[in-house]
């Protein structure tokens, strides 16, 4: 696939100050199709207003993982805008429309957004990569000069180390990395920067050193976890509103006999 000019991709970084969570709006300028990555329930009106003002049509919400610090707006956005909820294949989300395996993805107009499975912070983490625009959305797998914790939600320090090294640090050095959080006002980093400067996962660190670092952390229990995790397993909806999950990409691949699945729902969404 040939390179697509970056100017054809609309990009907005959105912020929730209560939980220091970043959400991301991406849209194809030609088709006006949009995705929201990690939308936050409390900002439903802000995000729908932005879509309306920019005359965009939300086709997908993409989750990087089952969050423990906020409740997603994905379910409410689906109810309001008929968007499709997309998660990683290992998240356990009960009512997603698509559960993507690594190496598959979704089409956004002229752009392709690839799912890279990056477990370790949780067992179902996904990094979303738009290679044509040199962008990757790492969730909590890789933060700016840090990473997500590995002491709950089936976290595993060794898996996280290998995920970052094999699926994020193998992206081109100039790839801009956008995390799910930052607590110091930083907004973006690059693969090259994190390889060099990340004190936990930089190339100077060994796997054993990383495991030791993560094991020594004494972090407080997330204050929203008991509400957020059960709600996010339902895409943020109340139990009565949850519906059965959609087909997994593994099933679609088996049916089509292909290793790459291109999902394009056109203008009917």
Which role does the model predict for each range below?
Residues 2-57, 128-139, 145, 269:
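Conserved beta-strand hairpin/beta-sheet module of binuclear metal-dependent hydrolase folds
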Residues 2-4, 162-176, 180-269:
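Accessory terminal helices/loops
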Residues 34-37, 113-115, 135-138, 179, ...:
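Short hydrophobic-aromatic micro-motifs
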Residues 125-162, 166-170:
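A contiguous binding-surface segment within folded domains or other stable secondary-structure elements
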Residues 13, 25, 105-131, 135:
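Core dinuclear metal-dependent hydrolase active-site scaffold
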Residues 20, 41-117, 134, 197:
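Active-site HxH/HxHxD metal-binding segment of metal-dependent hydrolases
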Residues 39, 66, 90-91, 121-122, ...:
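Active-site metal-binding loops of divalent metal-dependent hydrolases
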Residues 26, 38, 65, 77, ...:
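Divalent metal-coordination and catalytic microenvironments
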